[in-house]
Regions:
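Two-component/phosphorelay signaling modules centered on CheY-like receiver
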Residues: 13-31
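Short amphipathic alpha-helix used as the core "switch/output" element in two-component signaling
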Residues: 41, 64-77, 104
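Conserved acidic carboxylate
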Residues: 10
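Acidic, metal-coordinating helix/loop segments flanking the phosphotransfer/catalytic sites
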Residues: 34-50
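A Lys-centered signature of the CheY-like receiver
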Residues: 107, 120
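Active-site residues of response regulator receiver
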Residues: 54-55
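His-Asp phosphorelay/catalytic-motif detector in bacterial-type signaling
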Residues: 47-49, 75-82
Length: 141
């Protein structure tokens, strides 16, 4: 049986290395991307079972823009793939991505079509638990 595949997107190579080990130890096959362009290409090419995506990406683009581009694609895969956001942004920090949000909180998940959030610095058990949770929820649909 094939392993569940997770696309891990972060420009911090050391963090990617560490989180890859964490996710592989939990039984996942890990694919990685270092920026939004690589993330979009890898998602289209590899069709991972889940995506773990950093908020602050290089070139001035937030990871939320990657979510926006993925969810705009018409194929059902892109509408349904579970996405977990990694973020060091505190909830009081306003984000441009939330034009309808009344409080600018990154936890206003109803304004963003993602399934989970994990705070940075990442606690490995929290990441594994969140990936397991979003995958289980996606399979239950």
């Amino acid at each position: 049986m094939a392993k569940t595949r997770v696309l891990l997107v972060d420009d911090d190579r050391e963090l990617v290395r560490v989180l890859t080990i964490v996710l592989e130890d939990a039984g996942y096959e890990v694919l990685s991307a270092g920026d939004q362009h690589e993330a979009l290409a890898a998602a289209a090419r590899e069709r991972p079972d889940a995506i773990v995506l950093d908020v602050m990406m290089p070139e001035g683009t937030e990871g939320f823009h990657v979510v926006w581009h993925l969810r705009r694609r018409p194929e059902p895969y892109f509408q349904n793939v579970p996405i977990v956001i990694l973020t060091a942004i505190h909830s009081a920090t306003p984000l441009r991505f939330y034009p309808d949000s009344t409080d600018g909180s990154y936890r206003a998940g109803e304004y963003l079509p993602v399934q989970g959030f994990v705070d940075k610095p990442v606690e490995p058990p929290a990441l594994v638990a969140e990936v397991q949770r979003v995958l289980a929820a996606a399979r239950a649909l």
